[in-house]
Amino acid sequence: MAKKKTSSSMARSQLAALLISLCFLSLASNAVGWSRRGEREEEDERRRHGGEGGRPYHLGEESFRHWTRTRHGRFSVLERFPDEQVVGAAVGGYRVAVLEAAPRAFLQPSHYDADEVFYVKEGEGVIVLLREGRRESFCVREGDAMVIPAGAIVYSANTHSSKWFRVVMLLNPVSTPGHFEEYFPVGGDRPESFFSAFSDDVLQAAFNTRREELEKVFERQREGGEITTAPEEQIRELSKSCSRGGGGGSGSEWEIKPSSLTGKSPYFSNNHGKLFELTGDECRHLKKLDLQIGLANITRGSMIAPNYNTRATKLAVVLQGSGYFEMACPHVSGGGSSERREREREHGRRREEEQGEEEHGERGEKARRYHKVRAQVREESVIVIPASHPATIVASEGESLAVVCFFVGANHDEKVFLAGRNSPLRQLDDPAKKLVFGGSAAREADRVLAAQPEQILLRGPHGRGSVSDM
């Protein structure tokens, strides 16, 4: 009887041990699952929000998606700006894109449902527009900027025998904000002709031609896709008719033509770099779109003085070199996990209420807090600087930095530089200085504000240690 009890007791103990082990295994499995799911969610979040420090105001090259990619070139489009409420509605509908074409590459005719403003980063080419019943052919080269209206049928080619043709562009969709499409009249499988969507009866009536002949023309299978290569003699023929002005244009102020930023005198230059700009007064199409283009060549180890734009939001694309940018922002920090948790917690009205509680004190006064947004930048980094946000861009010690800037909302905009010889803070009158800084500190404030003898482009923060994302 004792043996039976002992045996029964041992069996119960073994069963209990087995159940406990299974519980621990289940908990461990769930923990691993939760951990992996959390890692996946964080990774997805990083991919959606640029993957680097400074988001949503900074997006790296990994945020571009290939629309077209062949051995003859690529067309890549930056993902939509991740947090439109923070970045601002001013640029939420715009898209940034990069085009690269190999030597003697040819781009098939197409049109966008978006206005296109582009800057030639490198190389040379020919761009042909079919619009308003005529053909316009333009020679473009490095440093040129140009506007192509939505709906214009465009084809182009790299006219150089050994250099790549590289273009940075800003697209302003006219149908759906933030979304645009490219339409090809002639194609096969890739790209497909948009005529393939129409019925045979409609096409035969429209072109007064039999279906078989239409298919041979508009749905002919071509090798190479949207970007192909062309024989040298055909490239030469395309180049013969192109001009710097509008071939066949009226010569009016509304004439479409390329304008060279680097071929004109910089609006500011010193030992620390050069700044160029193309305004709406010089290009009526830019004024119509409420845009402006700027180019900053910053000497290595130099910086742009902290500044802001009164009305325009700046979209800056790094063309060459490396460095970092800093910005004072009242909306979010430039950080990572805490920012993600905040976005996850705040939804709809609850988010507005929580933000209202953060922004106002016990007496209903707004608590003014500014966060530092900071990120390293390199080629194809994109920076968003909203209107009135003080910011600076610094070139690294090792190489100069070239940045093209698209200013959205540029009509009636002004640039305000906060440090240096042209700082408006130097214009404070004496009574105001005593009230702002305190009577005893007014003279010290004068010394601080007058200590920088240069303006706009300045010597950078040398010897301050390495820069890292924060």
Curated annotation (Swiss-Prot):
Annotated GO biological process: proteolysis
GO molecular function, a single term: metallopeptidase activity
Record function comment: Seed storage protein. Globulin-like protein that acts as a zinc metalloprotease. May play a role as an initiating endopeptidase in germinating seeds.
Species of the source: Oryza sativa subsp. japonica (Rice)
SUPFAM superfamilies hit by this protein: RmlC-like cupins
Disordered as annotated region, ranges: 36-59, 240-261, 330-368
InterPro entries per record: Cupin_1, RmlC-like_jellyroll, RmlC_Cupin_sf, Seed_Storage-Functional
Positions bearing carbohydrate: N297
Basic and acidic residues bias spans: 36-52, 338-367
Enzyme class label: hydrolase
Membrane-crossing residue ranges in chain numbering: none
Protein localization: Secreted
Binding-site list for Zn(2+): H347, E352, H360
Cofactor(s) the protein requires to work: Zn(2+)
Entry protein name: Cupincin
GO CC, any one term: extracellular region
EC number(s) per entry: 3.4.-.-
N-terminal signal peptide: 1-34
Domain called Cupin type-1: residue spans: 57-215, 259-445
Family: Belongs to the 7S seed storage protein family.
Keywords assigned by UniProt, alphabetized: Allergen, Glycoprotein, Hydrolase, Metal-binding, Metalloprotease, Protease, Secreted, Seed storage protein, Signal, Storage protein, Zinc
CDD domains in alphabetical order: cupin_7S_vicilin-like_C (cd02245), cupin_7S_vicilin-like_N (cd02244)
Quaternary structure and interacting proteins, as annotated: Homotrimer.
SMART domains membership: Cupin_1
